Design a protein with these regions (language model features):
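An N-terminal-biased, well-structured beta-alpha scaffold segment characteristic
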Residues: 1-92, 194, 214
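Structural/interface elements that position substrates and couple domains in central-metabolism enzymes
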Residues: 2-5, 13, 21-25, 99-101, ...
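Short glycine-/small-residue-rich Rossmann-like dinucleotide-binding loops
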Residues: 52, 197, 203-205, 231-232, ...
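Residue-level detector of alpha-helix initiation sites
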Residues: 54, 75-78, 93, 97, ...
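Beta-strand-loop-alpha-helix segment that lines the small-molecule cofactor/substrate pocket
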Residues: 60, 64-67, 79-91, 201, ...
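Phosphate-binding beta-alpha-beta segment of Rossmann-like dinucleotide-binding domains, i.e.
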Residues: 87-89, 94-143, 158-159
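Rossmann-like dinucleotide-binding domain for NAD(H)/NADP(H)
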Residues: 91, 105, 215, 224-307
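Rossmann-like dinucleotide/phosphate-binding beta-alpha-beta segment
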Residues: 132-223
Length: 307
């Protein structure tokens, strides 16, 4: 029977279904032990992971039987895809399965930051009552700039269209928008930086996108935008982001991803209670519903692949 190794959490019903067809080893904490993964990977034809398992060249060197890697999520920066290609190992992300969850996070974070909820909350729990002292605005008719217009970027645009946002989108690989549920215009980075009141980032982490949003980018922002990042932390220069906030170049930010995860004290010590910001531990795409969709999708793909 084909052997499958699962190194991070998966929906239980999906796992039970997988066990009908494969010999499964499931250890949701195995990602923490790189040496153990390197030691045992030679036994398995299939591997199912999330974003914490590092599938490096050292792991793949020992993966003599490996034919399929299922990614319970979207980003592939934790997988040496070039080596996989050379070894003819199929890499399957769960494209689109968590798009609704991420889109909800982006819209809800945008609303919270536009309303300055983090600032109001902090003041209120301290016994203050700044009902008229702090000014907030409505989200309707704000200009949203979406950087990266793939499956998730388009889903964000769909949700944002419904609540009356104006939308600019940038993606060098998208030539036109043919979705009637989306009211958006394709644009360029310069226009997005200059005009947007909210900027949401939906890019893969590559050599091209690493540190892409930096001091130079912030210097072009004229409307004190909200910055939201649910893609990969290293796309934004975190030092430049904090600096832009303190200089009133941006009016707030929501980060679900960070250059180093878990977040380290060097960064979180810079975050003060009175800042208009939201920090979350890489959960924008992780909900009960999305976990079911992602897990079922990868289970179907790996079952189809081997049968």
């Amino acid at each position: 029977m084909t052997k499958i190794l699962i190194t991070e959490f998966i929906n239980q019903d999906s796992l039970d279904n997988l066990k009908k067809y494969f010999d499964i080893k499931y250890d949701e904490n195995l990602y923490e032990n790189k040496l153990e993964l390197e030691r045992i990977i030679h036994n398995y034809e299939g591997l199912i992971i999330r974003n914490k398992t590092q599938v490096t060249s050292d792991v793949l060197k020992n993966a003599k039987k490996l034919k399929f890697i299922g990614r319970l999520g979207v980003g592939l920066d934790n997988i040496d895809t070039e080596t996989c290609k050379n070894k003819n190992i199929h890499v399957q992300p769960a494209t689109g399965m968590n798009a609704d969850s991420v889109a909800e996070y982006v819209v809800s974070s945008s609303m919270s930051l536009i309303k300055k909820i983090p600032i109001f909350h902090n003041a209120t729990v301290k016994g203050e009552w700044p009902r008229t002292k702090i000014k907030s605005t409505e989200i309707k008719q704000k200009l949203l700039g979406i950087i990266g217009f793939g499956t998730i970027g388009k889903k964000v645009a769909e949700y944002s269209t419904k609540i009356g946002l104006k939308i600019l989108a940038y993606d060098p690989y998208v030539r036109e928008i043919n979705d009637k549920k989306i009211d958006a215009k394709l644009s360029n980075l310069n226009e997005i930086y200059e005009k947007s009141e909210i900027i949401s980032i939906h890019l893969p982490l590559t050599d091209e996108t690493k540190n892409m949003i930096n001091k130079s980018s912030f210097s072009q922002m004229k409307n004190k935008p909200i910055i939201i990042n649910t893609s990969r932390g290293s796309i934004i220069n975190e030092v430049d982001l904090i600096d832009a906030y303190h200089k009133n170049i941006i009016s707030g930010f929501a980060l679900d991803v960070f250059e180093k995860e878990p977040i380290e004290s060097e960064f979180y010590n810079k975050i003060k209670p009175d800042m208009n910001c939201i920090l979350t531990p890489h959960i924008s795409g992780v909900t009960i519903e999305s976990n079911v969709r992602v897990s079922d999708y990868i289970v179907k793909k790996i079952t189809d692949f081997f049968n």
